């Protein structure tokens, strides 16, 4: 049923053809069940494991590697002799890499789908329903409820479906609907019509929503929506419809992969074509097919050389290390790639309650009446420090600390706060914090009494558990609470009836203490308290009191004000009818006004500094809240989102005002605004969409079920540690301490991680460029193979992987939070950098080929062939006069390969040192600025020695141990790469950067 909140109860009952007392007939139940289905959220149609695995192989680079593995497997099948073992190592290793990558990918995808399942925990198990087959109420499974059912709910129940209230069977009905609307206090419901067809869920006071909790009272209503049609069901649909976007880094790596795969394909084809003339060379036994297969192998080697197989593992490791560092700062990261996205966050949309504020109501101002002379009324105004529930803070008058017990008015005010109150403080020993037990507003009064300590109780020697309610207990020993007149909407107040405790023997009679909305309470006051006397309330005094209340309620702080009053001579208990709430207002008359307190949910202390940090880092902060606009703007001013005197027109909107704008202006509003109040979940998603259309990278915080769709849609969803499981599973990050400042620390960490990733991605890619150049040169010049696929895999995975991982530990730049966020479109490798890699890669390739050629042509223990003989080695036969005096076997010696591989590895170690900083010289950033890197270089070299000197590894890798002279040549050929890169850095620093 649509718009049920705008219909009368009779219209709702008539719509479903149901009688309030008997409920639906079994025929109607069956018909509605067939029509609307069970009252549960449909299970998420997740992808099957097979589909998830298949998805991991959609990446082009992965497919090229897979193809390379299949080809080398087929070729290995036809090998004979001792080659066979080596031949099978390569396809086996490639497959292992692919499997490992797929496992990580599938695991992350699986995590993403848990969010929708977590909604299930808000589904109630049972419901209490009236149906015509039984006289009394019956308990049935909640999934069997249908629209039209008459349902009963009572305190402690979870609301089983969306319900339109028909009648309330208690004084009040309070519902905690914070999971759905984000309201920090429970809401009082009624049964009257809410005529506004565009009311937000917060304003539908005659509706109960599925999954919310009944805090107090008992009521009967008619089910108007079940399952997917409920408000919580709509949230599920929205989440299911939200596609996860790829992070900026993932998009870049995808683009890079596509370009790389095109380049690889071109080079492979080119190598093949260049050598078509050699297919018939004698070395292949004159068989054209064998020649084709030989060059096919080289093409496979090229593919393996060009793909940085170690990259996914190194990225995952770096992100995982980043998440550990963030966890120490209270930011728990749930999805690894989002660590890097945090670094380019340009807008943070933050919830107000609990994130920017403490979500601990606290009284910050109060007044009692000082004196009344004729028409002139003077007040004693006080401010109170401390912004949490901890009973620590001072009472100040004119910025000087005062003792509250010296003011008679404050003693009575404290008495009312302590007695007219059902809440208390509790010290949670495991968390080490003071927490509320009961309503936030009342707990603020309890805390106020502790701070005032009007009877000078000795609290210094008490433990924290005893301290929590020490001063309140003293007051409760003087007066005993007999009964409470519950709060009701019509009178907007509550009261308690108290009698003096026997022990106190005080000369006071019975009293009624009242607290409530100032306008309503003052209307029922006939007197005001001045010191210990009471003075008749004149219109001048009343105007003075109301003007201060209005100023507090609408001024800079927009405080929530409560008036406190006493009925000095209440009626006798036996004359009061306590089961008729409508008569309570008669007993709360002839009151004496005592004072007024103003409270707010205060901003966290550290938030102001964080917002300043965001401003310097070029990040915009937008506050989004379900609270009203006045309160929201006041908090924005207090924390520095708005200046004290800023004009906020066009910069702060309510959800309704935002909806009233045409789409073009809504777009503009999202560009300018810094505050959205009275917002529904759908607005949050809309705001994220508009921000994304300006290419902003948005972080969105939330804690309720209602926030889940927006959390899922934003690039970075941030849930609160104290929030609902749904919010946590829909988000990328969870704040363990619910603190806004933690987000800013996480953004800083994200920026540092991205800078380091850029360094090691570039490092790994320059290594691959070198390998490709090496293979291309040997093939183009017709030289013997310098590197084979097994060796390339070893270098890419192991020897390069270790320093690359260590580069993730580079210390962050000092000015990292003074720069604007990087654009997500900024390429990983710009034009100049591309040239640098080509230059370095070209040198790496030339040096490796050079090392192999050196052994053939110049080494003392080498064959000393000429360059012509080397480049035509394929035509070597015993009867070819060009090769007289040389055995053809020398061209298959493992020494030149070992030389080439050693040069490659050593150059890569030098390159790792070059990567310590993008443009800083090694003189400015010495190697010991990153000890992890030095350690990993030593480890990589040790592993290289391992495959040269420890049997049977040299056989598998087709290598042989080198002597001292050969190592000398290796070092001579490797070190110039440092000089070359220093030169390129010098050019970048002095001619390109400014």
Swiss-Prot record:
Disulfide-linked positions: 876-888
Gene name of this polypeptide: ATP2A1
Protein name from the UniProt record: Sarcoplasmic/endoplasmic reticulum calcium ATPase 1
Enzyme Commission code: 7.2.2.10
Keywords: ATP-binding, Calcium, Calcium transport, Disulfide bond, Endoplasmic reticulum, Ion transport, Magnesium, Membrane, Metal-binding, Nucleotide-binding, Phosphoprotein, Sarcoplasmic reticulum, Translocase, Transmembrane, Transmembrane helix, Transport
Cytoplasmic topological segments: 1-48, 111-253, 314-757, 809-828, 918-930, 986-994
Residues reported to bind Mg(2+): 351, 353, 703
UniProt source species: Pelophylax lessonae (Pool frog)
Binding site for Ca(2+) 2: 768, 771, 799-800, 908
Binding positions for Ca(2+) 1 per the UniProt entry: 304-305, 307, 309, 796, 800
Catalytic reaction(s) noted: Ca(2+)(in) + ATP + H2O = Ca(2+)(out) + ADP + phosphate + H(+)
Function according to Swiss-Prot or TrEMBL: Key regulator of striated muscle performance by acting as the major Ca(2+) ATPase responsible for the reuptake of cytosolic Ca(2+) into the sarcoplasmic reticulum. Catalyzes the hydrolysis of ATP coupled with the translocation of calcium from the cytosol to the sarcoplasmic reticulum lumen. Contributes to calcium sequestration involved in muscular excitation/contraction.
Membrane-topology descriptor: Multi-pass membrane protein
MF terms in GO: ATP binding; ATP hydrolysis activity; calcium ion binding; P-type calcium transporter activity
GO cellular component, one term: endoplasmic reticulum
Known cofactor(s): Mg(2+)
